[in-house]
């Protein structure tokens, strides 16, 4: 291909793009692109999946973002920033986090960036300006709204200011005073106003960049994208009206020989191929505000104490199997020391001890019971070598350590973290999180964002609501979805099918395999096709139920942040699995209602009888 896509919105521009990251990268690889960008609206949520998938296909990922620019009087236009290097990447994180800060995002849910504050964050960033919502468009036309809505090139030519070049130069000079690299760009679009503006730019400027504003891959997505936008407008009048134009938004319809496409390589030449993956930022654990410098040695000390309490003072280990225990402990300690994650266990142990010290119930579940060190530290209540103490020791009954931690995943650039789920009473969770914040610093601890997605049945119901509102859509959708096979029963088959086609989902499987669903598909093809395209796309923001990131440094320097109305605080604007790729250390502290009830029952009984222990309920 003779060009680089530099202005691309994926599904992480929530409800404004049908472009799934898998689908995007797959298309890039098929068409032979060597580099491409991701530039979602006011966020970089998709940077990790895009980076990883692009790298896997041999495509250079360009990290960027489209920002809404404001001044004291309101919205003024949009710019697109691309990261030249790691410095620019860090600066973009800071800019996006400021745009979505409590002071701005809380007011009306809109991200706001001010040019006056960008000078200190401009290093390492490329600025692109010139699309439909930019100050270039607004300043070039005498009546930009009329030009935007016009279907006549002749009318738009009349509306184009005679001094449009001077007006554009004023906009460019304003941004050139902040950024070293500023490029004027325009869309090759069927929109008359953009065609007129594009011709004017080509006539007056040599250094411009053709840069279409991509929102989807397939032409079939045009009406789907249009319906999503119109549905938002119906629910929220504040959502911008957007006119959909084939050549402007659709990646697959851009020609292989894109006009002046080689000019995009002038931008690519400025961009380094830098890495964003980071090792775990585990805080140094301390006791009584004193940092313990040798985390490995302190973990050994804690393990010795646990061994003494459980197996010397407590239940004796049969002499014949002592070597099994000592060998397992040595092996686990060595693995954690090599991975440099000893501090992780010290932090979890400290949290557990704090909760127990408050007289509250706490439990860990899942694979952590396969770790002997977790048992020695009282994180887990199960001895993995003798999980059933009523039975004699047997190698076959051991809980495998590999189920808990697979050291084979570690390499020179990546260290996997353990996954210990800690369950606590919901009423105590805020207090526990406050303890963690006070110990490691409020700027170093944050919740994580999560996103609800259009799932199979829900996607179909949403499609009926939008496309067939006049019909009895709810009853029809319910009748159809009751015929669906439980997704859990075919999960392995779906994984195999998705390896060949990432967009394959539960709706298509039911159409292909359930005859009664196929009949409904023939009757409501438009609705089903809409549902298939939105299936798995993110739609709403929420807060991860358990995940908490604890770092050795202020999180705002390493992760994009956003305001959460639910918590009334800043949270990390990247999903949990992606946060770990960027060096985040996740601790799962889940409020479990059943635990609360068991604890209340214990207290009620003990008020009368005083012999029940929570751990025996």
Segments predicted by a language model, with ranges:
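Alpha-helical scaffold/interaction cores of sigma-54-like transcription cofactors
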Residues: 1-617
